[in-house]
C-alpha cells in the first residue's frame, strides 16, 4: 500500500507489482486489498499459479477457483484472465496508461498460470477487445445449419479451440471461439449501460457484451474458475448459455484427469455444445448419449461439487 500510494504521500509515483499465490491473495489478504483501494492505491496484483486445475498437484489448499469473483466485488479493482502473452502485454500497457496517464486510482488484478502452451500471433485489431473483455480468436471454419459459440479464458482457451475444430470435423457444427479476458469488465460496462438506459428511456445504448453475444447462437463458456465467474454476463447473452466451471474442492491429480473430473476439457466442451444444439432441436435425439459413450464420459456420476 505504501508503494501504491507513493504518488500521493511522497509525490514520487512508483509502479508496484505484487506477485502472490492467487489462492492466498483475495482469500487471505482481502482486508488489505480493500484498505489499499480505499487509500486510492495504484498498481498491479499478479495472481500467480492461478486456476483450479492448472496448479495440479497441491490439492485444496493451493488451487484457486474463485479469486476472480472476489476481485469483482472491489470497486477499484480490474480483474483479468489472459490466455496469451500478447494479451498480458496489452493489459499491462492499458493499466499503466489508466494509472499514470489518466490518473485513475485503480488496481489491476492479473491471473498468471504455470502451464506452458503455444503462443499464437495477435490478431489485427485485437487490443480493443482485449481491454473491453472479449474478442474473437477463431472464426467458424465453414457455414453450417448448426452453429455454436465457445468462450474460453486462460489456459482453458486451448481446449475451446480444440473443441471447435472437432465439432466441425466430426459433427458438422460451425463454431466460433472467443477469448474472454475479463468477465468483470464486461459486466461493469453492462451495468453502466443498464443504468444509462433506465435513466434515459429515449436514448438507449447497447453494451459491448450484448454486441458480442446478444444474438441467438447457443453459447458455451468454460474457464478454470467456478461457474459464477462466467455467469456474471448471463443476462446479456441472447441464446442459451451453458457454463462449465470448476465448482468444488481442489484435488491432487494430473491436469488431464482434473479437467476431465471438473468437465472443462475438450470432450466436455463438445458434449456441452452438442447438448445445447440437441435441446434446441438442431441435433438428432440421442446425439449426446451416443457421443458421451464413445468418449467414455459418465453421464450418471456424482456431483463434482460435493
Task: Set out the residue ranges of the language-model regions.
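A glycine-rich helix N-cap at a beta->alpha junction
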Residues: 34-52
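Thiamine diphosphate
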Residues: 53-66, 72, 79, 87-91, ...
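A short, small-residue-rich loop immediately preceding and capping a beta-strand
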Residues: 10-23, 44-47, 152
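Histidine-anchored nucleotide/phosphate-binding helix
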Residues: 1-5, 29-33, 162-166
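Short glycine-/polar-rich loops that comprise or flank the Walker A/P-loop
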Residues: 40-44, 76-77, 217
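Alpha-helix C-terminal capping segments
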Residues: 1-12, 35-40, 72-74, 234-236
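Active-site nucleophile and cofactor-binding loops and adjacent substrate-binding regions
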Residues: 18-26, 48-50, 56, 60-61, ...
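Extended, hydrophobic alpha-helical segments in both membrane/secreted and soluble proteins
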Residues: 15-20, 26-32, 36, 67, ...
Amino acid at each position: 500500500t505504501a508503494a501504491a500510494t507513493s504518488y500521493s504521500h511522497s509525490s514520487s509515483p512508483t509502479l508496484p507489482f505484487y506477485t502472490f499465490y492467487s489462492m492466498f491473495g483475495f482469500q487471505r489478504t482481502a482486508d488489505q486489498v480493500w484498505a489499499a483501494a480505499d487509500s486510492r492505491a495504484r498498481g498491479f496484483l499478479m495472481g500467480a499459479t492461478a486456476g483450479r486445475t492448472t496448479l495440479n498437484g497441491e490439492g485444496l489448499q493451493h488451487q484457486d477457483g474463485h479469486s476472480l469473483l472476489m476481485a469483482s466485488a472491489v470497486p477499484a479493482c480490474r480483474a483479468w484472465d489472459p490466455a496469451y502473452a500478447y494479451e498480458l502485454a496489452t493489459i499491462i500497457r492499458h493499466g499503466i496508461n489508466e494509472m499514470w496517464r489518466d490518473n485513475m486510482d485503480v488496481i489491476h488484478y492479473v491471473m498468471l498460470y504455470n502451464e506452458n502452451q503455444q503462443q499464437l500471433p495477435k490478431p489485427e485489431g485485437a487490443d480493443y477487445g482485449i481491454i473491453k473483455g472479449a474478442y474473437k480468436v477463431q472464426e467458424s471454419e465453414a457455414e453450417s445449419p448448426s452453429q455454436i459459440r465457445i468462450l474460453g479464458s486462460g489456459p482453458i482457451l486451448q481446449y475451446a479451440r480444440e473443441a471447435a475444430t472437432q465439432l466441425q470435423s466430426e459433427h458438422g457444427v460451425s463454431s466460433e471461439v472467443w477469448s474472454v479476458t475479463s468477465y468483470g469488465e464486461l459486466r461493469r460496462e453492462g451495468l453502466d449501460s443498464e443504468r444509462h438506459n433506465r435513466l434515459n428511456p429515449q436514448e438507449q445504448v447497447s453494451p459491448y457484451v450484448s454486441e458480442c453475444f446478444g444474438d441467438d447462437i447457443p453459447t458455451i463458456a468454460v474457464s478454470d474458475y467456478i461457474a459464477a465467474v462466467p455467469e456474471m454476463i448471463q443476462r446479456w447473452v441472447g441464446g442459451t448459455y451453458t457454463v462449465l466451471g470448476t465448482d468444488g474442492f481442489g484435488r491432487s491429480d494430473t491436469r488431464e484427469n482434473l479437467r476431465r473430473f471438473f468437465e472443462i476439457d475438450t470432450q466436455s466442451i463438445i458434449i456441452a455444445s452438442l447438448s445445447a444444439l440437441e435441446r434446441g432441436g438442431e441435433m438428432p435425439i440421442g446425439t449426446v448419449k451416443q457421443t458421451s459413450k464413445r468418449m467414455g464420459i459418465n453421464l450418471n456420476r456424482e456431483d463434482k461439487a460435493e
